[in-house]
């Protein structure tokens, strides 16, 4: 461990903004933790089906406010991509090579999970596992991948949207919701918000990369204004309080992204930007920075395999136990289930560690050694001074 810490510290450029990497790691871990807490696999009537404690326990809604951290991921993504594209242009790197490299790093680990689960689904069907069970498990793994497609599209559009003010996509989200929800317009209009909704934090990140929002006043305005707007939309405009989809719910704030989700995302981004200073101070410690660097190096591996880790623990326990286990196979309809689920989280994490050990090479490609880690090598030299001022 000491050797790893030393290698990561030695390989990190002096001007790298470590706090940005920490925000990305926190965003990924927030999504993972949220999925593990609000996703249940119920074993009954000879099948396994998905369920959510949010449908039975509305008092758990604040969990979605803490763990729905995708806006922070898009904030960081926009900041890093805009800075990377600016650096590429200065060095004369053509757009095709730049975007090809970034998309390859994004999708390289996706191929592994798709192949493994295609084979697993085929084997389960041949072995006699019911189609509803196979469909429920596959959906659990594949449905979170939607955000990668959106992120890839925004990455490809970075040269066009890098200077777009985040208010413009926010206005689009506002008008789409006004028409589809307020005026009874076609539901299909919501597809516009799939792009526009996530453009808001992405463009905000690009604004930060250009040197915007340096002062704390603007960041506090995002946090407080976004919070007040989201609360008002929930209280008086009929938006759901949960920031994730709830089975059986009247509507979802994420599918497609709603105005309430966009407002809440702005609040999250404001909080994230306010945390940059404290995070930079903490990350001066080499051991803490090494953990953040390792998580970033395998961020997509962690995201892609976290649901599989939960599934394998659930399935293994179902085969070994004499009866359904609380917090794992039972209906998530009381506080006892939540307490039991908390004790299963370390087991899920251990299983995920195993998948990380096996599949991290898909994300890291042919790189070797601490000095070759993506988390260290992506630093753009021209951002060093800007990072210190932010």
Question: Language-model features: where?
Answer:
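Alpha-helical transmembrane segments and their immediate juxtamembrane cytosolic regions
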Residues: 2-390
